[in-house]
From Swiss-Prot:
Keywords: Disulfide bond, Secreted, Signal, Toxin. The keyword Disulfide bond applies. The keyword Secreted applies. This is U-scoloptoxin(16)-Er5a.
Amino acid sequence: MNTVSVVQFLAVGCAVFVLYGRGVFAAEGVKKAGQHKDAELCLGSDGLGHRLDEFWYNDDMCQRFLCFKDDEGIMYEQIANCPIAIAEGDCTLKPGRRATTQTVRPAVESPP
């Protein structure tokens, strides 16, 4: 079987639909970051402190997180999921690799 990234799907001839948000992740939402003992760190969903503009990942859920500060100085945690992909015809969809590879993409497998 051929395995290709969705960026290469035209070469395989399978119909693939991919919904992308910012970059390779589909933005899911933003929430106010919790208060960490160090005021310059975001308290992430993972319970750890993260520096401003730092990315961290949950590979099991294929999620990427970002700590940022708005114009008023309030820290937020941005949560983004991997893109959604649909394969049609004889093609099958393989889940994306780990979220820590910033080029996460689902893959499409086509029959030989």
